[in-house]
């Protein structure tokens, strides 16, 4: 296993409708005095010189947290698969860390563990928690872009199903692992 990890791009998905947040843009919702995106940014900024945020609104608010912003090719918030495709298209490195904007407890150890697993297996790596895949915590080789584009063209809209068309390494995490907490509803902001 290599000691040094290769350069990676970071893709933060912030392009959703925020339905469980009453339509509010989740990445910009305050938690502990800062927008959720600021918490994620603080962890990932030292890990990459290529930080991309997929957002479909509020670009001016996200700009300070990214090197580049991308939007979905289709209107009406088509889902995380569209955001991943858009992000992979502009990523500068061969490995891309994919994270949600509403996961402020993610840490460097988890990200580096996923990256190491992906590089060692020369394939995508995704968190598995309690037997379930968690595609919002993954590392993808940029070369999976055509597979995801083909899945999209065939009508697939599930990021997880599209990713599982290829070999994926699973990083097992406990069900109680707080690093995987998604703050995707108002009651979660009280945690």
Curated annotation (Swiss-Prot):
Disulfide bonds: none annotated. GO terms for cellular component: cytoplasm. Keywords: Cytoplasm, GTP-binding, Magnesium, Metal-binding, Molybdenum cofactor biosynthesis, Nucleotide-binding, Transferase. It is found in: Cytoplasm. The keyword Cytoplasm applies. Its cofactor is Mg(2+). The keyword Repeat does not apply. Mg(2+) binds at residue 102. It catalyses: Mo-molybdopterin + GTP + H(+) = Mo-molybdopterin guanine dinucleotide + diphosphate. One of its GO terms (biological process) is bis(molybdopterin guanine dinucleotide)molybdenum biosynthetic process. NCBIfam families: molyb_mobA (TIGR02665). Belongs to the MobA family. The N-terminal domain determines nucleotide recognition and specific binding, while the C-terminal domain determines the specific binding to the target protein. Transfers a GMP moiety from GTP to Mo-molybdopterin (Mo-MPT) cofactor (Moco or molybdenum cofactor) to form Mo-molybdopterin guanine dinucleotide (Mo-MGD) cofactor. This is Molybdenum cofactor guanylyltransferase. It comes from Pseudomonas putida.
């Amino acid at each position: 296993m290599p000691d040094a990890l290769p350069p990676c791009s970071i893709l933060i998905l912030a392009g959703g409708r925020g339905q469980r947040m009453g339509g509010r843009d989740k990445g910009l919702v305050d938690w502990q005095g800062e927008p959720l995106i600021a918490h994620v940014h603080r962890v990932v900024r030292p890990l990459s010189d290529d930080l991309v945020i997929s957002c479909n609104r509020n670009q001016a608010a996200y700009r300070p947290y990214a090197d580049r912003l991308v939007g979905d090719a289709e209107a009406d918030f088509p889902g995380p698969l569209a955001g991943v495709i858009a992000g992979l298209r502009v990523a500068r490195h061969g490995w891309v860390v994919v994270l949600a904007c509403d996961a402020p407890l993610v840490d460097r150890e988890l990200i580096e563990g996923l990256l190491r697993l992906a590089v060692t297996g020369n394939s995508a790596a995704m968190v598995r928690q309690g037997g379930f895949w968690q595609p919002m915590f993954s590392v993808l080789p940029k070369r999976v872009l055509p597979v995801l584009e083909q899945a999209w063209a065939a009508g697939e809209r599930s990021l997880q199903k599209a990713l599982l068309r290829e070999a994926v390494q699973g990083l097992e995490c406990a069900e109680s692992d707080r690093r995987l907490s998604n703050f995707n509803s108002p009651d979660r902001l009280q945690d």
